[in-house]
């Protein structure tokens, strides 16, 4: 183990995936519900993970019709991107044998809500700025190599660089 990354588990998965590519696939199936009661946060659902589940709630800020009683859906999305990048950075460092004594990450961006407010067609997102700060005995060159590997291997970065197909379905219930 290196800085809370279990390298033996990664090694075992790599070996498994070399024999069975499907072993690298992890399916996600999330569910949530819009709450119509004025006394409740607007949206909620359970998020399952290997050792349990967590209830997540979202509420729009007041200017989008909520009360700001919970993080917005976008805040979760951005936290997910930041967490994915940071986790990938720590994992790539461990896989390369680069020890991290400490790592902090910041994500900064602006969101233009004019489109969501019906004021025209505007790109809502422009520039994700990830800033990773590491304390390590590694050289700056090694840290930059880990950054490069992270940029190449982080699923969140990949999703921002490549259009991901999607489908939407709306069904009226009786």
Regions picked out by a protein language model, each given a short descriptive name:
Residues 1-79, 91-174:
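Extended beta-strand/beta-hairpin segments
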Residues 86, 90:
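Aromatic- and glycine-enriched beta-alpha-beta binding-site module
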Residues 81-85:
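Alpha-helical metal-binding/catalytic segments enriched in His/Glu/Asp
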């Amino acid at each position: 183990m290196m800085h809370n990354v279990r390298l033996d588990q990664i090694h075992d998965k790599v070996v498994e995936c070399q024999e069975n590519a499907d072993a690298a696939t992890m399916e996600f199936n999330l569910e949530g519900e819009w709450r119509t009661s004025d006394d409740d946060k607007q949206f909620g659902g359970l998020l399952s993970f290997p050792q349990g589940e967590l209830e997540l709630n979202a509420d729009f800020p007041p200017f989008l019709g909520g009360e700001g009683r919970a993080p917005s859906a976008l805040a979760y999305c951005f936290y997910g991107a930041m967490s994915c990048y940071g986790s990938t950075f720590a994992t790539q460092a461990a896989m390369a044998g680069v020890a991290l004594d400490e790592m902090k990450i910041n994500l900064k961006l602006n969101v233009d809500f004019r489109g969501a407010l019906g004021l025209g067609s505007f790109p809502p997102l422009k520039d994700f700025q990830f800033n990773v700060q590491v304390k390590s005995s590694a050289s700056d060159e090694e840290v930059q190599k880990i950054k490069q590997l992270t940029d190449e291997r982080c699923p969140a970065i990949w999703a921002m660089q490549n259009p991901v197909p999607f489908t939407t379905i709306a069904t009226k219930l009786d």
